[in-house]
Amino acid sequence: MSSRSASFLLRPAAALYGVVMSLRNHLYDRGAFKSWRSPIPVVSVGNITTGGTGKTPLVDWIVKFYEASGIPTAIVSRGYGRQTKGVQLVSDGKRILLGSRDAGDETAMLASRNPGTIVVVAEERVEGVQFLMREFADRLPGVIVLDDAFQHRKIARDLDIVVVNAGTPQELDAMLPAGRLREPLPGLSRADLIILSKITDDAKAAPLLQKLRETGKPVLRSKIKPGKLVKVDGSENGATEPAVKALAFAGIGAPEGFLHSLEKAGITVKATKFFRDHEPYTEAAIRSIIEESKRQEFVPVTTEKDWFRIADNPQLTEMLAQAGCRYLTIAPEFLDGTEELEKRLLSVLETKVVNWPLSPP
């Protein structure tokens, strides 16, 4: 069965899901469902589709902006793909306490990239925020960044940022499970700011850009900038290596973006192996990657997020280190609106912190 046929058959379920999400949003908008408001300013970064929008690099950029501005910051994330449940402290801002298996690959990467930041995972973000306020009452953060929380309306936010992938406009055509929309497009009316990410061609992105601007919300444009190609054995941490002939492997939501970043870095991709988003790597999968790389004399290259998923397993780590594996770092690069984003990020700091403890929501 073709993917188009499968999508058509799933349309009734998608329509029902859309009705449920619309009703849920309506009840929140009318006040029938309540959102708890944190006394610490909250910035939410989320998306309206599943996976692959560039949300995590943006969270990293925002945290670094606040820290550079002298504002202590905390991250609260769901920790997608983790094997733990409930509230877990990933980093206390002094040391990293959990790896990707217990924190989720994206959260583990954010904690590693921001060693001075408190990082908590919790399915219920309210519980995560209240936990960090209890546990860190002597050094409360000045702002909390929620990772992937646009649909998590149990907690109010002072700034709601939505990231949309410019490379896959067709994802906005159908609800889950027929498509990748998490909620109907009118939900974008809740956003304070929309970022059209991963732009590789201005002309191709123009129709989606116009569609997003019709929401009346400010729309910023960004692309992904490739960074360093890092050897996983730690022997080198420098610039990219254009001479590398790569076997690219990844388990992410939009692997075509990874391939584009490798191309922009001047790396020649000779072969690919892709897995499902957040899928755990097995010894057999890694062995297959290494064997093909050796046979073809290619270098195995993956994403930084994938590497954090692998790094919890010493055996797989050693296998890839001996094979000369690298991972590519990335960062968002704004094509316009940087000052607008920074202005809005600073404006939320006008919210005052009140005394803890608070009444439960």
Swiss-Prot record:
Entry's SUPFAM superfamilies?
P-loop containing nucleoside triphosphate hydrolases
Molecular function (GO) terms listed? ATP binding; tetraacyldisaccharide 4'-kinase activity
Keywords assigned: ATP-binding, Kinase, Lipid A biosynthesis, Lipid biosynthesis, Lipid metabolism, Nucleotide-binding, Transferase
Give binding positions for ATP: T49, T50, G51, G52, T53, G54, K55, T56
Pfam families assigned: LpxK (PF02606)
Which pathway does the protein contribute to?
Glycolipid biosynthesis; lipid IV(A) biosynthesis; lipid IV(A) from (3R)-3-hydroxytetradecanoyl-[acyl-carrier-protein] and UDP-N-acetyl-alpha-D-glucosamine: step 6/6
Q: Which InterPro entries match?
A: LpxK, P-loop_NTPase
Q: Which residues belong to the signal peptide in this entry?
A: none
**Under which EC number(s) is this enzyme classified?**
2.7.1.130
Q: Name one GO cellular component term.
A: plasma membrane
Any single GO BP term: lipid A biosynthetic process
Q: Which reaction does it catalyse?
A: a lipid A disaccharide + ATP = a lipid IVA + ADP + H(+)
**Family statement:** Belongs to the LpxK family.
Query: Which NCBIfam families does this chain map to?
Result: lpxK
Per its database record, what is this protein's job?
Answer: Transfers the gamma-phosphate of ATP to the 4'-position of a tetraacyldisaccharide 1-phosphate intermediate (termed DS-1-P) to form tetraacyldisaccharide 1,4'-bis-phosphate (lipid IVA).
Put simply, this protein is called Tetraacyldisaccharide 4'-kinase
Q: Which organism is it from?
A: Chlorobaculum parvum (strain DSM 263 / NCIMB 8327)
Which taxonomic lineage does the organism of this UniProt entry have? Bacteria, Pseudomonadati, Chlorobiota, Chlorobiia, Chlorobiales
Q: Gene of origin?
A: lpxK
